[in-house]
């Protein structure tokens, strides 16, 4: 829970289904909320659906208003990244969101059961930048698609192998 005490960077929690990624992310969010940090936790496909509703003339909030809210919340927890349908619009919105938060140095927690190879390159580079992101591999998950994740350049650049849950 050290991350929750002072969330400043990004945390990527990766693992197969059923390993506790969402539960851990929710615990981080609840702790941060309890100490007064503004938190938004949303499942990636639900976020995209929520944003699409902003285009409806019957919605009281515009797309821009909804997107700004997600982009600027102090701590964003994006659950199950990679489970959304990959469309050009969805890919672009997710990149815009992550890129904005990356450039603004806003703390972000992302959970995924996708491996690096299945992610769009520009999203992957934001999630795995060793300058701002730490990775927690749940249950020996092989995020990099290699036999030993500690041999990747990401692990070496942080000076330690990825943490395992």
Region spans (language model):
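Pre-Walker A adenine-sensing motif
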Residues: 1-5
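Short loop/turn elements that form and flank the Walker-type P-loop nucleotide-binding site
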Residues: 6-7, 35, 70-73, 101-105
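Walker A/P-loop nucleotide-binding motif
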Residues: 7-25
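Short glycine-rich substrate-engagement loop in P-loop NTPases that contacts/grips substrate
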Residues: 33-72
């Amino acid at each position: 829970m050290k991350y929750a005490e002072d969330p400043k960077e990004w945390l990527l929690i990766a693992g197969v289904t059923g390993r506790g990624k969402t539960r851990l992310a929710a615990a981080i969010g609840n702790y941060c909320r309890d100490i007064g940090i503004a938190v938004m936790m949303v499942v990636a496909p639900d976020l995209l659906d929520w944003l699409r509703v902003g285009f409806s003339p019957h919605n009281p909030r515009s797309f821009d208003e909804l997107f700004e809210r997600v982009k600027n919340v102090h701590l964003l927890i994006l659950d199950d990244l990679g489970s959304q349908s990959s469309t050009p619009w969805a890919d672009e919105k997710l990149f815009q969101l992550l890129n904005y938060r990356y450039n603004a140095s806003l703390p972000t927690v992302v959970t995924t059961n996708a491996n690096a190879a299945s992610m769009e390159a520009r999203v992957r580079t934001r999630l795995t930048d060793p300058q701002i992101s730490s990775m927690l591999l749940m249950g020996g998950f092989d995020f990099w698609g290699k036999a030993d994740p500690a041999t990747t350049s990401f692990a070496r650049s942080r000076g330690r192998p990825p943490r395992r849950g």
